[in-house]
Amino acid sequence: MPSYLSPGVYVEEVASGSRPIEGVGTSVAAFVGLAPTGPLNEPTLVTNWSQYVAAFGEFTQGYYLAHSVYGFFNNGGSAAYVVRVGGSRQGEGADATSPAAVKAAGTPAALPPGEPQKLGTFTVAAVGSGDLSVEVADAEGDGPEERFKLIVKDGRKTVESFDVTAKKGQRAYVVTQVQERSRLITVAEAAPGAQLARPENQTVVLKASAPATPGADPVASHPGPAEYLGDSADRTGFGGLEAVDEISTVAVPDLMAAYQRGAIDLEAVKAVQLGLIAHCELMGDRVAVIDPPPGMNARQIRVWRQETAGYDSKYAALYYPWIKSFDPSSGQTRLIPPSGHIAGVWARNDFERGVHKAPANEVVRGAVDLETQITRGEQDLLNPIGVNCIRAFPGRGIRVWGARTLSSDPAWRYLNIRRYFNYLEESILLGTQWVVFEPNDHALWARIRRNVSAFLVNEWRSGALFGQRPEEAYYVKCDEETNPPESVDVGRVICEIGIAPVKPAEFVIFRLAQFSSGNGELEE
């Protein structure tokens, strides 16, 4: 206490006994991908689209990072860390808005087509490198005679496959489908529209287009799994994100661009996605948004989810199918992986409703169409295995229609439960830092109980916890039972917290019965 030696009035500041816990943010995303310029392997914060363009350049044809970041901000995201992997350090420190950078941003993947080959009333040409061939085969199942399957192979490996039709104006028209989905070939009409017909079953070998400059091969520019995984000591790849605490969502949209170009196969895709999931599990405060391979129907994605990928994690969520969005680099609509838009939907949902609300039944802004229209019967097969579907509803737009993790544990089935626990854990962790080195006695235990309870009662009042009274929604225990003498002697203070989170109304069931007034209920 201070000493008072002379008469007078003294004012003392007394610390308040209450130290309120504040909720942390849950809407900061991280994107790992390719860009024509910008810092290499350095997490860079951008808070709007203009900042991204200044640091990493505009939309780049054939890559998805810029589209994903744009979709994130368009759907309500406010802050994101971007990690540029692959490429060279030549563009580091350059002004991405300079004429040279803008020119480079629009063309690194846009190689001139190779020599076109005849394919019936169509022509096909290669835009990628490698020993490419195109095979025309019969379509699966019954259907009109103009239907066929177009298979693109790099050597003996199938790298792209399209179920198409030769009938112009149809959704599956071969020219439109290849233009929107292929990164390796282009198809053009070689006859008037009335004369277009299904090509005969055949295989044609394509001559790859030559890179415009030495080393400009787009496949070579794609990083391998090791570059994505990175190293925490060197702060590269996913390892570089370990130093950024505020990240809550992670996506790797350009992984599928590398797969489409044949730079990596599905085994490498799985290795990177497993590394992404492992990173989120290691950090314990973020969730991975997984993109499926393109061009898969509901049956194929079910097989891929269960047999090929087989992921089982409460820190990851899978969304299907790909969405169609406008591509300013080509002036046309393009299919892009949904992870960037989904991360924005999560951020918007957290801001408008709270992280405790499942990020589903939300409109995907910027999506003009879907790669595949999913029926209710198909979703009946996909939803139980953790595939969150994106569906188009008449008069309601394109919406996220699933909110599950990839976990087989029923306790962590719902995505909002996992993300809400991340929010609580991080908030309590940061809000109780003052406890360290305080005297470990009953007074400290009471202060901890009071502060944590004050935080949780506000969560209950906001509708995040289940129960009609606070006692039914949570409990906080920090006393002699949780802190016996042997625990106190080693410098530990243990607080036990239990909560009852609100789970989403995933299945809304109305039971209707017919009854006659005065005569009771009528049964069928």
Tell me the role of every PLM-derived stretch.
Residues 1, 167-170, 177-179, 184, ...:
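Detector for methionine-enriched segments
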